[in-house]
Curated annotation (Swiss-Prot):
Annotated stretches, region: Transactivation domain: 13-73
Cited Pfam families: Homeodomain (PF00046)
Protein known as: Pancreas/duodenum homeobox protein 1
PTM annotation (Phosphothreonine): residues: T151
């Protein structure tokens, strides 16, 4: 029966082997075993008789094996040696509170689900406000880099900047420093705002000049003539321009005024040396 007792004692020691592990080197004896520290589990109670396990063995044992009582494991010299060292190991102080335990690397104890958050000055901007409500923010590998947020100017700041731009299209550095202090902005913000405002102003000026050139290139539109002036009768009734000599030509005949000219005659005025021929009246 002594062999069976040693068998059950060895089985129990195998189950609780993590609690009885000791470091191989003597310099590690000052700290608790690695399994106790990493597992962070309370130490198991000292071994004692197991009536429950013994009853299970009695139920499952064949009829030819008679039940027996297992003596306390403390009577075994091997188990007594372990009991002698167990209280000393459990009474050891905890490891010193430091950034990392002895022999451990910094990357080993880092939490696996730790997420690298953006910088504090990026959290307060509106561009990153949606990240707090986004469900996939915890799975982001790294924050977005090389992205500047757009500066939101207030109405008071825009009013002062527009007033300054009305007087000076190009701002000097002393005035820029003064505006930066007065409007609670940086010099870079004011410089970039003036650059953008000048570009907008130049585009507006080019558009105005382009509209005026299009009107001037086509020429000034002539006033519309009256429909009566464009008729043939009024054109014939108008007196011809005076010749360069200054002599006044005779008046055009009435028939020419009324447009009743024969086919062979024209309504053009004759020179002053030749007398006009009168048309024959029909009989």
């Amino acid at each position: 029966m002594n062999g069976e007792e040693q068998y059950y004692a060895a089985t129990q020691l195998y189950k609780d082997s993590c609690a009885f592990q000791r470091g191989p080197a003597p310099e590690f004896s000052a700290g608790p075993p690695a399994c106790l520290y990493m597992g962070r589990q309370p130490p198991p109670p000292p071994p004692h008789p197991f009536p429950g396990a013994l009853g299970a063995l009695e139920q499952g044992s064949p009829p030819d094996i008679s039940p027996y009582e297992v003596p306390p494991l403390a009577d075994d010299p091997a188990v007594a040696h372990l009991h002698h060292h167990l209280p000393a190991q459990l009474a050891l102080p905890h490891p010193p509170a430091g950034p990392f335990p002895e022999g451990a690397e910094p990357g080993v104890l880092e939490e696996p689900n730790r997420v690298q958050l953006p910088f504090p000055w990026m959290k307060s901007t509106k561009a990153h406000a949606w990240k707090g409500q986004w469900a996939g923010g915890a799975y982001a590998a790294e924050p977005e880099e090389n992205k500047r947020t757009r500066t939101a100017y207030t109405r008071a700041q825009l009013l002062e900047l527009e007033k300054e731009f009305l007087f000076n299209k190009y701002i000097s550095r002393p005035r820029r420093v003064e505006l930066a202090v007065m409007l609670n902005l940086t010099e870079r913000h004011i410089k970039i705002w003036f650059q953008n405002r000048r570009m907008k102003w130049k585009k507006e000026e080019d558009k105005k000049r382009g509209g005026g050139t299009a009107v001037g290139g086509g020429g000034v539109a002539e006033p519309e003539q009256d429909c009566a002036v464009t008729s043939g009768e009024e054109l014939l009734a108008l007196p011809p321009p005076p010749p360069p000599g200054g002599a006044v030509p005779p008046a055009a005949p009435v028939a020419a005024r009324e447009g009743r000219l024969p086919p062979g005659l024209s309504a053009s005025p004759q020179p002053s040396s030749v007398a006009p021929r009168r048309p024959q009246e029909p009989r």
